[in-house]
Amino acid sequence: MLYFRFPFSEDYNFVDENLDKNPVSFHSFDNLEILDFSGEIESISKDEILSAEILSDSLSSKLPLFEEEQQSDYQQKLLKVIDFIKENDLSKLVISRRKLVKYEGSPINLSRTFLNLCKAYPNAFVYFFIKDEKCWLGAFSELLGKFNKKTSEFETMSLAGTIPVHESWTSKEIEEQKPVTDFIKNILNAYSEKVELSETYDHLSGNIKHLRNDFKAQIVREDVEKIISELHPTPAVCGIPKDFCRKAIGKFEKDPRNFYAGYIRVENDDFVQYFVNLRCAEFFQDAALIYVGGGITAESSPEKEWRETELKAEAVLKNIDFS
Ligand SMILES: C=C(O[C@H]1C=CC=C(C(=O)O)[C@@H]1O)C(=O)O
């Protein structure tokens, strides 16, 4: 099953798994796993979601053997990452961890958790799925791409840099977001004569904010999937050079990213949209793993980076319904 809600919409959707169409698919970070949801996109009411009442008790898998990375270990590792960034002259490298949430005997109401996330993040793409013994929920507003089938306009954004809502930007975040903008600009310029780029502005997300630029470009329909495969993973979730940074992530992160920092493709009559899968968590019968990361630069402070991941984890954590 899959429930989802588009950004700025009040309607909830599900996909009935009956037909040959594949309107929604989840792509893992490493692109090796694609989870398809086939059928028609149908609408579903809040009451129907509530009455289905899906609890963590009903999930088939328990959390496999897992050792959570502690603050001191994570910070030690980030010191090594910073050295690596300096040695290789990288502008940034995105490193992530998994925060463990044990239910301690009180099951989670996953349906209510989904609705809480929808309420808390009106500008986000919010989803909840259970399939092939996997269960994930997420809510985030970063667009990897949006293609308008009628006008052939392609939209995307560069989103990076994080600070608490009431703090002021420093050169660290500004320098962290720039490579994302440059990376996207270079790709779009190869596919379009006309690429529009907005000013940089603040993108609010609960207790934190990010730096953001929006792009618009006229493209041809046949290029959409090619552009997406060049864009993913952007330096907002990986780094540049892409393949070098992907390998470095594999070396520094002790657990796989799975669907975290991958993307979700959703197609309807008007658009094909691709949402970056951040602020997400994997749920098991007895515990959940919240996936969080951040862009590390030569200027990073390991302690601040740890705090940033804690703040990002809050985005999901505070909306979990312990029934
Ligand atoms: C990698 C994550 O966030 C990305 C998106 C916005 C800001 C980011 C940052 O400030 O590091 C990251 O690039 C995450 O939330 O796990």
Predicted features and spans:
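An anion-binding catalytic pocket shared by soluble metabolic enzymes
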Residues: L19-D20, R97, Y103-P179, E267-G293
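Structured alpha-helical segments in the cores of large, soluble enzyme domains
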Residues: Y74-K86
